[in-house]
Each structure stands twice: as structure tokens, then as C-alpha cells.
Amino acid sequence: MSDQRPGSEVPRGFGAPVAWVAGASRGLGLALARELGLAGYRVVITARTAADLERARELLQADGVSVRTIVHDVRDPVAARDVVAEVEATWGSIDTVIAVAGLMKVGPLPQRAEDYDQSIDIMLRGPINVVHAVLPSMQVRGDGRIGIVTSIAGLIPVPHLVPYTAAKFGALGFSRGLTEELRGSGISVSTIIPGLMRTGGHWHADYSGQPGNEYAWFTALSALPVISIEADRAAKIIVGGVLRGRSKIIFTLPALAGDLLYRLSPEAVGLLLGWAGRLLPGPGDDQQPGFRAARGVTSDAFTRITGPARRAVRRWNQQGAHQSGGDASGS
């Protein structure tokens, strides 16, 4: 193996630990794969779109990460088991898995039934499928690290994000249930609860009602330095916590403050969120992905405010081959 170049698909350190990031062709998933690779892991990245995975592989290899790509849809439990079988046959046991595949549906009620179906299939059933595929081998070994990316929206309901909130509430419950079920087994489960991050995910979110106006508020909020954090910083926090076996990883100051306030006074926080919801755009009949909704938002002030969000789109492979809001490739 010594003649393999750094970052090639068959790495130099064949005995290095293996991590699987489910939903890693862009956004937070890509940042997590990079951080795990820099920590010495051989990293398996999966997503639904081969072209975006290939571009992600190039970006990771440029950083010296040993990476393997497998096209995989987290909604398919059989496909998840196939990923595990393929990795175990070539690289060995999966030591760490992080389920991060996600999508955003932003808009007022009422929302389509398929918006709920897609959100729950990807962000609740997806982690269930991934964990159930990798868990048997971990249980045999009595060792493993599992991370499930939920959201502060899984703790505190957020206006205009009801399908997302519903799915993340479920994922959070699944993750916490796993934590208790596996306590003392040698397998740690980390429930990851991020606030807003500058991952470029606004570019692929689906906006309904008044797409341009929904895109404007969501993108501006996700770009503000105090409100959100850079994806690579988020990845360091997550990977560090997962590898240390922390059961709860919650971050951004607004998320920490919101969690505390909601536990102390859910009624007061609910009133505040209701007031904020009334300031958001009203209903409408249109639905567009972010990269289309963006065309209708051209003010100079918006352009200045959202500079960090645009840079994140470029940095984290959001302008990939697949221009759709539901690729489930990492928020």
C-alpha cells in the first residue's frame, strides 16, 4: 500500500479507522467528512447523486482525505445494508457513522402532504435505516460511535419550517432512545443539535408560498455571524463530540439560549415565536428551490448581508450537478 498517493481511494493507512457520513456530497455532510479525514479516518461518503459525490471526492482528496464514494439513498433500508456490506468487504468495520442527510422545506401552512413525506423519509427514516444497518456489527464488537444530526428545530418548533420540525423532532427522539438503549454497551450515540450554520443549504431548500420572500428572510438569517456559524467550525464541534462519545452536542449561542429558555418557559418562547411567525411572508401558490427563488431577490442590501451565505454555497459544493431541493446530500 505504500505506493498509494495521499487521498487516493485505497489509502496508505489501511488499518486506520473507518467513518461513514450518510449525506456527504455537500454542505455539513461534506464538512464532516473533511474533518473526520483530517482526524485520520478513512471516510466513506454517500449520497444519491453520483456527479455531486465525484465532485465531493475531488474536494476531499485535495485536502488529503482518504475517501470512498457510494451512491446511496438513505430512504432505502436494503441499500443501507448494502453500503455496510461493501465497506466491510473492502475497508473493514465501520467505527463511526454520522447520519446527516437532510432537506429544508420553508414556507407557511398549509404545506403539501409530500413535503411531510419527504422530510420524514429522509430525516427520520434515513437515520433509522443507517443506524440499523451498521449497528449489528458494532454490537458484535461492543464498540462504535454513532452521531445523528437533528436540529434546534427538533427542540423548539420554528414557524414556516413545520415539515422540517416534525422530522427533526422524530430524529431527536430516535437518537435519545438509542442513547439509553445502548448505554453501557460500548457504543455511544450522540444527539447533534445545531443551530443555524453557514453550509450553503439555503441554495437547495424548497421555498413555498412566496418563494422569493421566504428565500430572502431565511438566507439573510443564516448568513448573520452572531446567529450562525461556519460549517467547518460546526464540523469540528460535531466530530470532536462524537469521537468523545458525548450524548448531547448542542451549539451556536442562540441554540443554547433557546434550549434553556424553552425549558424554563415554553409558553413565553411560544408567544415570541408566534409573533415572529406573523412577521414572515404570507401564503401563496408557488414553490421553488433556492437557486431559482434567488433570482427574484436582487437588492444591494441583501447582497451585502448574505455574502457569507454565498461563499458557503461555493465552498461546500452546493452548486453541484444536481440542482434540486431534495437530494438529501447534507444540509
Briefly describe each language-model feature range.
Residues Y41-R55:
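Conserved glycine-rich Rossmann-like NAD(P)H-binding loop of the short-chain dehydrogenase/reductase
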Residues V71-D82:
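The beta1-alpha1 cofactor-binding region of Rossmann-like NAD(H)/NADP(H)-dependent oxidoreductases
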Residues L103-D117, H160-P163:
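Conserved mid-core segment of classical short-chain dehydrogenase/reductases
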Residues G184-L256, R263, A268-L280:
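SDR active-site lid
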